[in-house]
Amino acid sequence: MEEEGVKEGGQRPRSAQTADKAGWIKKSSGGFLGLWKDRYLLLCQAQLLVYENEDEQKCVETVELGSYEKCQDLRALLKRKHRFILLRSPGNKVSDIKFQAPSGEEKESWIKALNEGINRGKNKAFDEVKVDKSCVLEHVTRDRVRRDQRRRPPTRVHLKEVANAASDGLSRLDLDVPDSGPPVLAPSNDVDAAQPRETPRPPMPPAKPSPAPETSSAGDRMETPVGQSAPAPVPASSEAHPGSQEDLETPVVEDSDSEQPPNRILPDKLKVSWENPSPEEAPDSESAEPPQVPGAETSEAGPREGGKPPTPPPKILSEKLKASMSGMEASGPAQSPGASEASAPGPAEVSVNGVDDSPEPLQSSQAAGPPGTPPKAATTSTTLPPWDLQPQLHPRCSSLGDLLGEGPRRRRQPGEQLHRAQLEVKVASEKTEKLLNKVLGGESASVNAETLLSQAVEQLRQATQVLQEIRDLEEMNREAPGLREKRRELVTLYRRSVP
């Protein structure tokens, strides 16, 4: 510490030894005509003690430096006087204090010491830690009454309740049994109810056989329920014609394991004699009874449920076909026999998807013959025409090119239209079978046979025309070879770009 302000003859007291700074400084008494008096100053931490002499017997003033902002040099008129001032901080009611040092070095040392004291006074609240004994934190559970024994463990009943609430029917803990073995998971009622719905045999993996076995297997599937559901007895009239009994026999497709029952044999009334049947292929059956069609559809849908997803139901017939069919039904009874013969199309128009071209000669011969003569026997088959096999519109898997090609410009519509047209042709053939059964059975004797026959032929012709238009549209919508090459290049570029 500096002792320049202390008088030469005196010794420094003990309190001055513990002070930060001590010395003689002139202090202004304040007022307009302030008097400067010599005072002995002691700087202790954040307090400035003012004494009249070094004995420190009488303390004139105690200054709290925390109430002041700073200590700086005082610009006086006479620069030869080394004066400095303590500036109060705003909000305090203390007055500014002016000091005068004996030299410039003493003034600078006092300014520095007083500024340090001011900082200590400002930070006094942060440096000191006050502990208030009245604000003792109380423990949360300290006031709880202590028992002689600890808390008892949870009972088995409580554990059982918790297990029942947590398991929620998934896994139940058997707490009643003392052995507590592995739990037995009993199936619920929903699982038992759902078991009969499952198919008895799992679907076989898809194979790639030749088209001929597929046709034969499909024939087996369709022939089995038809033959088992309603086996018709052989009429007495068939016994009288042993020659025609041989014609009624149809070849039965045999599996490697078991033989299938023979097809349903129709009575003589429902048999249609076909002129010039083709020796290579058996003529398709258009004179089958209407109850056979739903049976065939159910037998066809049965095996498909196990292996493939069910196809969507057939859509409503088109407006064009509806209008044409209603128009023909309205104008059919009014037509003359000559007009029906003139409107009958040629063999090229009647053939649809490989259907035999022989209905027209049959119909003309039936109309020309006398009503009393019984029709000749002919071979019949319950196999459905090729349009019964619905095309698979949705492939099971698709390549990357197909995935990139799908979008707003995908061409799935022509295939759907083709399937829809095939269903329309199928409906027309069923109606034709109904009309032929009416004519041959003699149910409607008042209605002219030629009129009904002309209606059936016209319906077949319209269905064939719609099917041909849709096929032409599908050929027009085929993608160009350049577009396919472009798609392949895009797939190659995508595969190369994938890290």
Swiss-Prot record:
The modification Phosphoserine is found at S167, S237, S238, S273, S399. Keywords: Coiled coil, Phosphoprotein. Transmembrane segments: none annotated. One of its GO terms (biological process) is macrophage apoptotic process. Residues 229-238, 329-349, 367-386 have a biased composition (Low complexity). The keyword Ribonucleoprotein does not apply. Residues 18-119 form the PH domain. Residues 1-11 have a biased composition (Basic and acidic residues). It comes from the Eukaryota. Gene3D superfamilies: Pleckstrin-homology domain (PH domain)/Phosphotyrosine-binding domain (PTB). This is Pleckstrin homology domain-containing family O member 2. It comes from Bos taurus. The gene is PLEKHO2.
